[in-house]
Amino acid sequence: MFQMKDEMQTAVKHNIRGGEGSPSFRYLFSAEQLGGRAEMMAVTTLQPGESVGVHPHETNGEAYVILEGAATVTEDGQARELHIGDAEFCADGHTHSIRNHTAAPTRFLAVIVPNK
């Protein structure tokens, strides 16, 4: 299955999970297209100072992969600075957040996968 960039759904969301700013999302595939293999697959852009607030994963897990820039990712209270190519996976029963602490945009891939 192919999905061209100009066919992808986009959204701007405000203060996600209590975070700051209005991150933008480009959904690579819909949940229906993914057939239950993933609940969400999106490239998210955080402008300087923007964040996705701390949130739990209770019936799924979420992976972040930094594609451009850098971000501070906090999992279960432990903060790490991630750079291009670095990744984090928040499993069921854990919490995480992501914040662009830099002066340049940060782009990351976010994939939410259901528990099996």
Language model features with spans:
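Short acidic-glycine-tyrosine-enriched beta hairpin
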Residues: 78-92
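A short, N-terminal "cap"/entry segment at the start of jelly-roll beta-barrel domains
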Residues: 1-38, 53
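Glycine- and acidic-residue-biased ligand/ion/polar-headgroup-sensing regions
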Residues: 59-61, 65-71
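Conserved short histidine dyad/triad with adjacent acidic residue
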Residues: 27, 42-57
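Short beta-strand segments in beta-sandwich/barrel cores
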Residues: 51-52, 69-74
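A generic "binding-loop/recognition-motif" signal
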Residues: 48, 59-60, 78, 94-95, ...
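Ligand-binding loop in jelly-roll beta-barrel domains
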Residues: 72, 92-116
